[in-house]
């Protein structure tokens, strides 16, 4: 990067700029962007991935919060006909404003670790617009996303992401690939929203509520954590053992509990 475009990473934005050419190339090869694609990059930073994405010929919208990076990105890529820059907070961004067709958006990002989980949940609310997502995240977060029942990593994030998406932990990235180096390892994850949900809930908001309540006290039994929502008999009627802890249940079991609660709310 030339001196004209130098920018110091800001801690309050959780900025760690990717600079390792080998890692950048590996990410771009995992994405395999094509000219007919509609790409959305969240947090382009200094444009480490942006140039390669633009070179694919695909239409690229980028969302960047840091106002100081806007002239840098405009200076580097503003003359590209397939580049469209949005200054703002991705957590508040209206993805419908892009006018994308259903299941057409390919979302990419080296996400700031301090907002990665809420941003993932925001994106899941727009899953019907998204074809796939490729993110650089804290390795621990990716492990939680990809986790299965029975372990300590299985929780609210695992369940809600896997409700909407197929999860692939692609590869890990060490701190040295960034400037400044983060204090944790990173990983690349691919999320592919399902065309047809394998375990559809009657109301996904009720599922979110049940999962949140269950894992608020994850060491307690379901009979205790869900007592304000469901009785012991209602848990049993859902085909679930109320003496189990939440981490012992799979996604399908949580959907059954949520559907029981949905029916209860309707009848009441």
UniProtKB/Swiss-Prot annotation:
Subcellular localization: Cytoplasm
Signal peptide segment: none
UniProt binding sites for S-adenosyl-L-methionine: 16, 18, 43, 64, 89, 110
SUPFAM superfamilies assigned: S-adenosyl-L-methionine-dependent methyltransferases (SSF53335)
Cellular component aspect of the GO annotation: cytosol
Highest taxon of the lineage: Bacteria
SMART domains membership: rADc (SM00650)
Catalysis performed (reactions): adenosine(1518)/adenosine(1519) in 16S rRNA + 4 S-adenosyl-L-methionine = N(6)-dimethyladenosine(1518)/N(6)-dimethyladenosine(1519) in 16S rRNA + 4 S-adenosyl-L-homocysteine + 4 H(+)
Main localization, broad class: cytoplasm
EC number(s) reported in the record: 2.1.1.182
Molecular function GO labels: 16S rRNA (adenine(1518)-N(6)/adenine(1519)-N(6))-dimethyltransferase activity; RNA binding
Keywords recorded for this protein, A-Z: Cytoplasm, Methyltransferase, RNA-binding, rRNA processing, S-adenosyl-L-methionine, Transferase
One Pfam family from the record: RrnaAD
Family affiliation: Belongs to the class I-like SAM-binding methyltransferase superfamily. rRNA adenine N(6)-methyltransferase family. RsmA subfamily.
NCBIfam families: ksgA (TIGR00755)
Role summary: Specifically dimethylates two adjacent adenosines (A1518 and A1519) in the loop of a conserved hairpin near the 3'-end of 16S rRNA in the 30S particle. May play a critical role in biogenesis of 30S subunits.
HAMAP family xrefs: 16SrRNA_methyltr_A
The protein's name in its UniProt record: Ribosomal RNA small subunit methyltransferase A
Organism annotation: Pseudomonas savastanoi pv. phaseolicola (strain 1448A / Race 6)
Lineage: Bacteria, Pseudomonadati, Pseudomonadota, Gammaproteobacteria, Pseudomonadales
Gene designation per UniProt: rsmA
């Amino acid at each position: 990067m030339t001196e004209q475009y130098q920018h110091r990473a800001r801690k309050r934005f959780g900025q760690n700029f990717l600079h390792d050419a080998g890692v950048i190339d590996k990410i771009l090869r995992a994405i395999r962007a094509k000219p007919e694609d509609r790409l959305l990059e969240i947090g382009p930073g200094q444009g480490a991935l942006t140039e390669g994405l633009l070179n694919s010929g695909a239409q690229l919208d980028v969302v960047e919060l840091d106002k100081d990076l806007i002239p840098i990105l405009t200076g580097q890529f503003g003359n590209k006909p397939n580049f469209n820059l949005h200054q703002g907070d991705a957590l508040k961004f209206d993805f419908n404003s892009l006018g994308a067709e259903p299941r057409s958006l390919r979302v990419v990002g080296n996400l700031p670790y301090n907002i990665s989980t809420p941003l993932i949940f925001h994106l899941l609310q727009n899953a019907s617009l998204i074809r796939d997502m490729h993110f650089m995240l804290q390795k621990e977060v990716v492990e939680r996303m990809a986790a299965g029942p029975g372990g300590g990593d299985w929780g609210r994030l695992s369940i809600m992401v896997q409700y909407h998406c197929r999860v692939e932990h692609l590869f890990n990235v060490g701190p040295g690939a960034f400037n400044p180096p983060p204090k944790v390892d990173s990983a690349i994850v691919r999320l592919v929203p399902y065309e047809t949900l394998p375990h559809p809930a009657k109301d996904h908001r009720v599922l979110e509520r049940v999962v949140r309540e269950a894992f608020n006290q994850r060491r307690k039994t379901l009979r205790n954590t869900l007592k304000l929502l469901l009785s012991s008999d209602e848990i049993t009627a859902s085909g679930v053992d109320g003496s189990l802890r939440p981490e012992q249940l799979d996604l399908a079991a949580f959907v059954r509990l949520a559907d029981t609660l949905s029916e209860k709310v309707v009848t009441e």
